[in-house]
Design a protein with these regions (language model features):
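Bacterial N-terminal signal peptides that target proteins for export
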Residues: 1-10
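Bacterial N-terminal signal peptides
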Residues: 9-17
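Intrinsic low-complexity, intrinsically disordered segments enriched in polar/basic residues
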Residues: 2, 16, 283-284
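Intrinsic low-complexity/disordered segments
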Residues: 4, 19-21, 278
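Beta-strand elements of repeat-based all-beta scaffolds
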Residues: 206, 217-219
Length: 297
């Protein structure tokens, strides 16, 4: 996944079978959350169309994404504040549908990142000291600090285990709602020759429930200062926002996803109105419209 992974299906009966969060220690809470997240990930075969706004140092995109088990079809509405005409949108999709190498690369990166995320999830209980910092009727907030006796098995784990931060858990479904963290010291590889991530490098992720037992990533914020690339599909500086989730058939093909993302009535581009009114203002870029609460693409 291009960190579009998080097509995680929580099995409702499994979640309900666990005891309440507040009867557990913080370490037990996080172990339970990890078990539920990993189980959901293994059982999730759902596909979704969603609206994505992505910011990287040299690129700003607004696009509809139709995810499948063989990759994701992207309908780019706006690139670097310039709206793409519909014929150009179709051309780019058509090019992707005929580019087997690009499809395989996308799937390879997604599989790599999924494995890495699963490995890091498994480390959460042992890699950190957890303390409860607050709770509501629906969520529990935890703070994490590095466990002094933990020995990270990989380079990625070493970076992960050097972070401190906070995590919010959904009390009923035992899912991660939010997690954020930052490095509290520089992390170097090979004495700095092979890479370095600087203190205060940070990340933040948010998930939202998009169906009765379906959760998806809704925000990704990565700000890593340095030159050690961890995830193949995530930039060292990246901010993604995802919304307007709509389900697709579980067995949808790339070709079918392309039709859905172009023809779905609710997926209208943020371009010009059908008939321009004399003296009217030009349409706002998609990025601005997404920020408006009443925006319906």
């Amino acid at each position: 996944m291009t960190l579009r992974r998080t097509h995680l299906v929580a099995v409702g009966l499994l979640a309900l079978s666990f005891p309440g969060l507040h009867a557990q220690s913080p370490q037990q809470i996080i172990q339970q959350v990890v078990d539920v997240e990993r189980k959901a990930d293994q059982n999730d075969h759902s596909n979704w169309i969603f609206l994505e706004e992505s910011d990287k140092p040299k690129e700003h995109l607004v696009q509809w994404v139709a995810a499948t088990q063989r990759g994701s079809v992207e309908r780019i509405l706006e690139k670097d504040d310039q709206q793409l005409p519909e014929p150009r949108q179709r051309d780019l999709i058509e090019k992707f549908l005929h580019d087997t190498r690009a499809q395989n690369k996308q799937v390879e990166e997604a599989n790599h990142d999924n494995r890495q995320i699963d490995d890091l999830l498994k480390l959460l209980p042992a890699a950190f000291i957890w303390t409860e910092t607050g709770s509501t009727a629906t969520t529990t907030s935890l703070h994490f600090d590095p466990a002094p006796n933990f020995h990270p098995p990989t380079r990625e784990a070493r970076v992960f285990a050097s972070m401190t931060g906070d995590l919010v858990v959904d009390n009923q479904q035992h899912r991660i709602c939010k997690i954020k963290g930052h490095l509290f010291h520089d992390v170097t590889f090979g004495g700095g020759l092979l890479g370095r991530l600087k203190e205060k490098s940070s990340f933040a992720l948010e998930q939202q429930q998009v169906g009765p037992s379906y959760w998806e990533l809704s925000q990704i914020h990565v700000h890593l200062e340095g030159n050690a690339l961890l995830f193949k599909s995530v930039s060292l500086q990246q901010d993604d926002k995802r919304s307007k989730f709509q389900p697709e058939p579980g067995d949808v093909t790339l070709e079918q996803a392309a039709i859905l993302v172009m023809n779905e009535p609710n997926l209208l581009a943020c371009g010009e109105p059908v008939a321009a009114v004399a003296g009217s203002q030009p349409p706002a870029p998609c990025g601005e419209k997404i920020k408006r609460a009443d925006f319906k693409p």
